[in-house]
């Protein structure tokens, strides 16, 4: 439902930076919902952001970037309560927005944020690293993401995740991750994209790899591995076979049909 009289303040982006983001990050064309369409009953506005509870201990955070010529572009991540602490998946677009996520956690959950894991080296996932570091939060990313971060204009995470041949994170590199089950499905949207399942729930986060079940395209393929995209999407589905709620970066949560549809679109790239 459109909410024409409700406008979010969103991060501003220069035309030059917008062009760079379209080349190196997620294209606006892959991001279908308007702000009004993204908001649903029960969503909570907090400053520039929107928060949606997905499960008793899981919330989706949504931030917006004002991209000239395209309007407000939404990006989603997760907040997970694990006993007496909080875990975060992905930053917002900017440091200021990421600080708002931390403020919301303080106000609504009032538990310390123990760590954050980011799912690849683009601004929508990694643009708020300085805010996390300023708050003393341990940050983790795929080792390849940390390698790519400087050339993407991003700040690298403090710790690098490595992965076994079967795609699962090496436990020694992901200490105290609790319910976060981190999986590298193979290259797809980017060479470094990782995914996260939430143990004890029916939720799996596909990040920018997975598109919703009504998507018309896979969006920006500038950094994509078109040869392996379909296999990587299917590997994500196989890694989390019991997940019935698929959360992704640029659409509302969907069913497993999102995985099937993404893989079928990617089949056409080969």
From Swiss-Prot:
SUPFAM superfamilies per record: Metallo-hydrolase/oxidoreductase (SSF56281)
Q: Which cofactor does it need?
A: Zn(2+)
Q: Where is the signal peptide?
A: 1-28
Q: Which domain of life is it from?
A: Bacteria
Q: Where in the cell is it found?
A: Periplasm
User: Which biological process annotations from GO are given for this protein?
Assistant: antibiotic catabolic process; response to antibiotic
Annotated InterPro entries = Metallo-B-lactamas, NDM-1-like, RibonucZ/Hydroxyglut_hydro
Chief localization = periplasm
What detail does the entry give on cofactor binding?
Binds 2 Zn(2+) ions per subunit.
Instruction: Provide the E.C. number(s) assigned to this enzyme.
Output: 3.5.2.6
Q: Which SMART domains match?
A: Lactamase_B
Q: Name one GO cellular component term.
A: periplasmic space
Where on this chain does Zn(2+) 1 bind? 120, 122, 189
Q: Where does substrate bind?
A: 211, 220
Is Signal there in the keyword field? yes
Where is Zn(2+) 2 annotated to bind?
Answer: 124, 208, 250
Q: Pfam families recorded for this chain?
A: Lactamase_B
PANTHER family reported for this sequence: ACYL-COENZYME A THIOESTERASE MBLAC2, METALLO-BETA-LACTAMASE DOMAIN-CONTAINING
Subunit note: Monomer.
Q: Outline what the protein does.
A: Confers resistance to the different beta-lactams antibiotics (penicillin, cephalosporin and carbapenem) via the hydrolysis of the beta-lactam ring. Does not confer resistance to the polymixin colistin or the fluoroquinolone ciprofloxacin.
Q: What is this protein called?
A: Metallo-beta-lactamase type 2
Q: Which gene encodes it?
A: blaNDM-1
């Amino acid at each position: 439902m459109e909410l024409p009289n409700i406008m979010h303040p969103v991060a501003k982006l220069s035309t030059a930076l917008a062009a760079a983001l379209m080349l190196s990050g997620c294209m606006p064309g892959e991001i279908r919902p308007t702000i009004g369409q993204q908001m649903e009953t029960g969503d909570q506005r907090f400053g520039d952001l929107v928060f949606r509870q997905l499960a008793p201990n899981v919330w989706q955070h949504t931030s917006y970037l004002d991209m000239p010529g395209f309007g407000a572009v939404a990006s989603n991540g997760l907040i997970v309560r694990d006993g007496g602490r909080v875990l975060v998946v992905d930053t917002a677009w900017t440091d200021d927005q990421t600080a708002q996520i931390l403020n919301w956690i303080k106000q609504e959950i009032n538990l310390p944020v123990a760590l954050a894991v980011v799912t690849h080296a683009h601004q929508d996932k990694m643009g708020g690293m300085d805010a996390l570091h300023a708050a003393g939060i341990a940050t983790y990313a795929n080792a390849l993401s940390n390698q790519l971060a400087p050339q993407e204009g991003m700040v690298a995470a403090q710790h690098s995740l490595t992965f076994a041949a079967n795609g699962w994170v090496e436990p020694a590199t992901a200490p105290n991750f609790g319910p976060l089950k981190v999986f590298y499905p193979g290259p797809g949207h980017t060479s470094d994209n990782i995914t996260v399942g939430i143990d004890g729930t029916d939720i799996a986060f596909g990040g920018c790899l997975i598109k919703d079940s009504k998507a018309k395209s896979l969006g920006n393929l500038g950094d994509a591995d078109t040869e392996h995209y379909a296999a990587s999407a299917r590997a994500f589905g196989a890694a989390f076979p019991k997940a019935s709620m698929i959360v992704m970066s640029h659409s509302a949560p969907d069913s497993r049909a999102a995985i099937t549809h993404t893989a079928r679109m990617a089949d056409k790239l080969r």
